[in-house]
Swiss-Prot record:
It is a single-pass membrane protein. Belongs to the KdpC family. The system is composed of three essential subunits: KdpA, KdpB and KdpC. The keyword Nucleotide-binding applies. GO terms for molecular function: ATP binding; P-type potassium transmembrane transporter activity. Part of the high-affinity ATP-driven potassium transport (or Kdp) system, which catalyzes the hydrolysis of ATP coupled with the electrogenic transport of potassium into the cytoplasm. This subunit acts as a catalytic chaperone that increases the ATP-binding affinity of the ATP-hydrolyzing subunit KdpB by the formation of a transient KdpB/KdpC/ATP ternary complex. HAMAP family: KdpC (MF_00276). This is Potassium-transporting ATPase KdpC subunit. It is found in: Cell membrane. InterPro entries: KdpC. GO terms for biological process: potassium ion transmembrane transport. The keyword Translocase does not apply.
Length: 189
């Protein structure tokens, strides 16, 4: 029995050290070395105060700010309740909520009734915490933001261009605008 127990305990100890100490330290080291900002949460500051993360959406409702995607994550982008709605595409509750959001989006942005509304403006993301909106969504909100801040639409469009992220690896997904970064840039004007 001792002949079998000693190798088993040795392997348990070796793999505990590898998977419990060596591997986590290596991953943390690589993350800090090559992706320090992301590994530390991509925290954004204003006046030396941390106000959020570039990776987690925040609720903005004032007319002078760009509005994020709708969130199913509790009240106002509650990270502790992160999730999508889990309602299927034919669910009556989801369809009614999307129709209501389309009407509200057109109204708050003074858009004609026949304006196509970007899907990201009326549907939540899988996590419910998506920090970005599409470029089309941002451009449709730009006139409202410019009017509320009493600045030119061109200034707002320039900020949108400056804060548009490229596609992942240059070809994956769509270009997107980080709402928190864009709103912080607006506040700096």
């Amino acid at each position: 029995m001792r002949r079998q127990l000693l190798p088993a305990l040795t392997m348990l100890l070796v793999f505990t050290v590898i998977t419990g100490i060596v591997y986590p330290l290596a991953v943390t080291g690589v993350g800090q070395l090559f992706f320090g900002d992301q590994a530390n949460g991509a925290l954004l500051e204003r006046d030396g105060q941390v106000i959020g993360s570039a990776h987690i959406g925040q609720q903005f409702t004032a007319a002078k700010y760009f509005h994020p995607r709708p969130s199913s994550a509790g009240d106002g982008y509650d990270a502790a309740a992160s999730s999508g709605s889990n309602l299927g595409p034919t669910n009556e509750k989801l369809l009614a909520a999307v129709a209501e959001r389309v009407t509200a989006y057109r109204k708050e942005n003074n858009l004609p009734a026949d304006t196509l509304v970007p899907v990201d403006a009326v549907t939540g993301s899988g996590s419910g915490l998506d920090p970005a909106i599409s470029v089309v969504n941002a451009k449709l909100q730009a006139p409202r933001v410019a009017q509320a801040r009493n600045i030119s639409i061109r200034q707002v469009e320039r900020l949108i261009e400056d804060h548009t992220d490229a596609r992942g690896l240059g070809f994956l997904g769509e270009r997107a605008v980080n709402v928190l970064r864009l709103n912080l840039a607006l506040d700096r004007l």
